Curated annotation (Swiss-Prot):
Claim: Translocase is one of the keywords in the record: no
Cysteines joined through disulfide linkages: none
UniProt entry tagged with the keyword Ribosomal protein: yes
GO MF annotation list: structural constituent of ribosome
Gene (UniProt): rpsB
Record's protein name: Small ribosomal subunit protein uS2
Pfam families: Ribosomal_S2 (PF00318)
Keywords attached to this entry: Ribonucleoprotein, Ribosomal protein
Superkingdom classification of source: Bacteria
PANTHER family found in the cross-reference section: 30S RIBOSOMAL PROTEIN S2 PROKARYOTIC AND ORGANELLAR, SMALL RIBOSOMAL SUBUNIT PROTEIN US2M
Amino acid sequence: MAVTMRQMLEAGVHFGHQTRFWNPKMAPFIFGHRNKIHIINLEKTLPMYNDALKYARQLAANRGTILFVGTKRQSRDTIAEEAQRAGMPFVNARWLGGMLTNFKTLKVSIKRLKDMEAALEAGETERMSKKEALLFEREMAKLVKSIGGVKDMGGIPDAIFVVDVGYHKIAVTEANKLGIPVIAVVDTNHSPEGIDYVIPGNDDASKAVALYTAGVADAIVEGRANAVNEVVQAARGGDGDEFVEVNSEA
């Protein structure tokens, strides 16, 4: 369902940061200021948000992978829930340097986590001493927290979706180095440079974060559903050409 400007207003998307913290590169997206707080121009935000969703929808239809990134307290739960709903990988704890640029190292950690999960499933921890089981449990919990959201990501993602580019500067830099497109929410205190699909908006309010993230997840789900429908329709069309009615009375 399309998001309206009223919904953006109700979610507080238009509230930027204090004017003294502004980044001049965001000037084209600022409507003005009130009580020393910059007000973001939603007439600019809405079409740019829709462009970002269109890209996410097309990428998903082509079986692309979008990595969701949001590690701030107010976005962690939303990022995990919406990414899982869309069947996409996510990072909602600390971003580990090299997650993209040194993916080989990440793969080693992912293998370790999967091996530990298999060991737990097989009941191997029951044969461990209390101390060994405790150490195993601690290591596994640490791995789940840091890389659990990307354990099924088979390779480098086709794009990343980021909430707060300043807080996730390393993730954006790594994506830029590898030429991975970046969809991101950019508030008035950060630069839109290096972002392929800019969504000018509040990156702190939980309602605003939920709105952006649910929108991207919806676009992905819709894109995949459209792709499946096209395949089904194409298959039906092919079968229709070959269909021959048989008269049983003949």
